[in-house]
Every structure is written in structure tokens, then in C-alpha cells.
Regions:
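Peripheral, non-AAA+ core regions of ATP-driven protein-machinery
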Residues: 2-13, 17-86, 93-99, 106-117, ...
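Conserved RecA-like ASCE P-loop NTPase motor core of nucleic-acid helicases/translocases
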Residues: 125-129
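Divalent metal-dependent catalytic cores for phosphoryl transfer on phosphate-bearing substrates
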Residues: 134
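P-loop (Walker A) phosphate-binding loop of NTP-binding proteins
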Residues: 103, 130
Length: 460
């Protein structure tokens, strides 16, 4: 007699499970996201496959010395986009499982379709679509002017059927669009549920490891911009990248959040055109599109994204508030960091903005999370408050502590060299980041305290 399916209550946002229903998830604090699921007992064969691991079949595993394992590097192959290769750590590793997410309309399917059409000229590829019909994909490829003669297409949502066909076709690269619509027959829940996403992703990852085929899975995102589905989805894959971009901007940023074969937080920049996505080889140029007129409240900083320095402009507007509670708005920067810096500026800089509205924005839609932007943000706000522009050939970076000290940041020499390459001739940096060999024609101001930076600003 077959066993009755088990019941579980699982959060659709984070995947946490509970013995009974409750209104709010204790893990992610989301409301009304816990649903009941019936989990059927998995067949014995499937259980044995899960226990065998990713690297081999059950019964043939053996203990090996770490020194005896081959150190031969896996040969990567290029995607045809240098920016995409940069984010992946130098190209696609055979047998890797990659997850790419992004908002609807960001260009995930377009980027992967362009990539596979290029690679199909020299290797065997397979594009599996579960959301769009084959005719819709063909129409998009025709509109973008892509070569379609050698690209293999498949419209299927059953993971078992997809892997069976992949075993026959033996592609080197396979795209699954998207993981949220795929399903397994053994999992008794609807496609897109936590159990289905978890099991299908684990099945595809195991298939990639044992067959040596690279698999790229497209994932949806939640309303706050994070990848939808259980957190275990990001744990079982090798690389997780996010394609981001505002709806009113033609630029897209591709950022790695997890990468077992390269640097994390690596950034690639693309531009959406009528012919699809085109890579931007010099991102600093698009983020520094400053006009001829010098305005107050503008400063240029150097941020470090993955393995590359990037020049970004910060805009600040400080204006007298007509309300009892002045507004503090930060776009592209952390709101809490802005509040801390305003307090430091009042305490150690002698400038108070308690009666001022403060608006700050990072040009180009870039999101800056590192603290090296502190000093540039403070000087931009002081510039707007005094209505006195900073010189256009000035670049600023440095972390500001709670005691008003200017702390050094990593890769100071590389940041200064990047600024000099783009024509900047003056820089305000932490004293510990002043290089021993200053680039020719560049003047460096090393500061130890916030008051020193304000004094340099007064003398410019």
C-alpha cells in the first residue's frame, strides 16, 4: 500500500518550512506567503541518485588524497561578450551551473539568445524555452538579425524529458528559460513552488556535473529585486548573476553575486539597442557624461567593482526644508549611510543640515555599496550647501569614520591611476592611500581628518 503524502507548510519567499500554518514567516518576516504542500515519497531510484552526489555514481566513490587530485584547469569557452566573460570570471566553465536573474524586460532572454546564436556557429548548443513559444523566440531572433541556422531549440517544461533529449543531443551549453516554469513528476506541487524550484535546480546541477555540460538557468526576481525561490537555489549552483537596469534607461549592469570560478561583485555594462544588447567597453565614460557648465553638488569618485575601478559621479541637492521633518533621499546609495555621514558632518565638520532637505543620486543607475564613496558624498553635499562647485578635474574617494577620521580604502593606487587615465589632475584621498609614485601631472591631497578635507575644498 502506497504511503500517504506528507503535508508541509512552506514560505514561498524564502523556503522556510513550518509544522502548521502561520500568518508571518519567522525567517523573512513576509506576510501571507506560507502555503500548504503535499510531498509525495520519492522513488527509491531518485533517492539513490540524490545520495550519489554530483561527481559520480553511487557505489564507485572512493577516498583520495588531496595531493593526488589533478590540478589541470578546466578549459573555459567565451560567450562572445567580453563583459559577460568578465562577470563569469573569464568565460564559461564546462559542467558549471549558472543562474541569471533580473526584472522583467531587463534583457535576460535577449542576452542568452544572442550568446547562443553566436556560439552555435562553432559548438553544439540547446535553448529550452518554457515561457515563450518557439515562434516567439524565432521572431525575436529575426528582429535582432541573429544567425539562427545552427541553434537547436526545444519547447518543454518537464525536466526529465529535457535531460533525456540533452543526453541524445549532447550540447556543450544549454539554457533553461526559466527555472520557475520547470517541473518534476516526482514532486507533487505546482511549477514555481519552493519544492519544484529546489528539486529541478538540484536535478539540473547534478546533470551538468555528471555530463560536463554548462547549464544557464533563468530565474525570476521578487518585488525587492532579489532572486525568487528558496535560498537553497543559490547554494546549489556555481555562479549567480543579476541583470539590472531602470526601465527608462538603456544601460544594463550585469553583476555576479556568487562565483566559484571568479571574483564576486564583478560588474559588466551593456547598452540596449535595436539590435539587442551591446557591451560597453569603457563604463566610466557613460557614467561621467558631464555637461560643459560647472554646477554645485557634483563630485566624482572611484569605486571598485570586482576587479575593475569605475569612475562614477555623485549628485547632491541640499535645500531649505518647508516641513518639520526634512527629507533624506538616497538613490544608488544606502539610506542609513547618508544619515551617519550627516551626523559626522555636523559633529566634526561644523555644518548642520537639520533644517535642510538632502537628495543624493548616483548617475547612471549604479548602486554603490562600498564605503569608499563617503568622502565624495560629503563634499558633494557641502558643495551644494555652499553653492560652490568642485573643480571638474577633481576626483575624491575615502571612508569617513564616526570620529571624523579619513580611513584608507583598498586598491588606492589603481583608483588614482584610473582617474589619471581619464584626465583628472587633482585628487583628495586618505593620507594612507597617497602613492609613492604619483602619476605625471597629477596633484594628490592626502587628508587624515574631515576638517582637513574641508580645508582643501576651501583652498581649491
Amino acid at each position: 500500500m502506497a504511503k500517504a503524502p506528507k503535508r508541509a507548510f512552506v514560505c514561498n519567499e524564502c523556503g522556510a518550512d513550518y509544522p502548521r500554518w502561520q500568518g508571518q514567516c519567522s525567517a523573512c518576516h513576509a506576510w501571507n506567503t506560507i502555503t500548504e504542500m503535499r510531498i509525495a515519497a520519492s522513488p527509491q531510484v531518485a533517492r539513490n541518485e540524490r545520495l550519489s552526489g554530483y561527481a559520480g555514481n553511487a557505489g564507485v566513490s572512493k577516498v583520495q588524497k588531496l595531493s593526488d587530485i589533478s590540478l589541470e584547469a578546466l578549459p573555459r569557452f567565451s560567450t562572445g561578450f567580453k563583459e559577460f566573460d568578465r562577470v563569469l570570471g573569464g568565460g564559461v566553465v564546462p559542467g558549471s551551473a549558472i543562474l541569471i536573474g533580473g526584472n522583467p524586460g531587463a534583457g535576460k532572454s535577449t542576452l542568452l539568445l544572442q550568446t547562443l546564436c553566436k556560439l552555435a556557429e562553432g559548438m553544439k548548443t540547446l535553448y529550452v524555452t518554457g515561457e515563450e513559444s518557439l515562434q516567439q523566440v524565432a521572431m525575436r531572433a529575426h528582429r535582432l538579425g541573429l544567425p539562427t541556422a545552427n541553434l537547436n531549440m526545444l519547447s518543454e517544461t518537464s525536466i526529465e524529458q529535457i535531460c533525456q533529449i540533452a543526453d541524445e543531443e549532447k550540447p556543450q551549453l544549454m539554457v533553461i528559460d526559466s527555472i520557475q516554469v520547470m517541473h518534476m513528476a516526482d514532486v507533487q506541487s505546482s511549477p514555481g513552488s519552493v519544492a519544484q524550484v529546489r528539486e529541478t535546480a538540484a536535478y539540473l546541477t547534478r546533470f551538468a556535473k555528471t555530463r560536463g555540460v554548462a547549464i544557464v538557468m533563468v530565474g525570476h526576481v521578487t518585488k525587492d529585486g532579489s532572486l525568487a525561490g528558496p535560498k537553497v537555489l543559490e547554494h546549489c549552483i556555481d555562479c549567480s548573476v543579476l541583470l539590472d537596469g531602470d526601465a527608462d534607461s538603456r544601460f544594463r549592469t550585469l553583476r555576479s553575486h556568487k562565483n566559484r570560478f571568479g571574483a564576486v561583485n564583478e560588474l559588466g555594462v551593456f547598452a540596449m539597442t535595436e539590435q539587442g544588447l551591446r557591451e560597453v567597453s569603457n563604463p566610466s565614460a557613460i557614467f561621467l557624461s558631464r555637461g560643459d557648465e560647472i554646477t554645485s553638488g557634483s563630485s566624482v569618485m572611484v569605486v571598485w567593482e570586482g576587479t575593475r575601478p569605475l569612475l562614477v559621479e555623485i549628485l547632491a541637492l541640499v535645500d531649505h526644508s518647508m516641513m518639520s521633518n526634512p527629507r533624506r533621499v538616497a538613490v544608488g546609495l544606502e539610506q542609513n549611510r547618508l544619515a551617519i555621514l550627516l551626523a559626522v558632518l555636523h559633529r566634526h565638520g561644523g555644518l548642520q543640515m537639520a533644517d535642510q532637505d538632502v537628495f543624493v543620486n548616483v548617475v547612471g543607475g549604479v548602486k554603490v555599496t562600498e564605503t569608499s564613496a563617503d568622502l565624495a558624498l560629503l563634499l558633494a553635499m557641502v558643495s551644494s550647501l555652499r553653492d560652490r562647485p568642485l573643480p571638474q578635474d577633481l576626483v575624491v574617494f575615502g571612508e569617513v569614520g564616526l570620529a571624523g577620521e579619513i580611513r584608507p580604502v583598498p586598491s588606492g593606487q589603481e583608483r588614482i591611476s584610473e582617474a589619471a587615465k581619464h584626465g583628472f589632475r587633482r585628487a583628495i584621498v586618505p593620507a594612507a592611500n597617497v602613492p609613492k609614485k604619483v602619476p605625471e601631472g597629477m596633484q594628490i591631497f592626502g587628508v587624515k581628518k574631515l576638517s582637513d578635507a574641508l580645508s582643501v575644498f576651501d583652498d581649491l
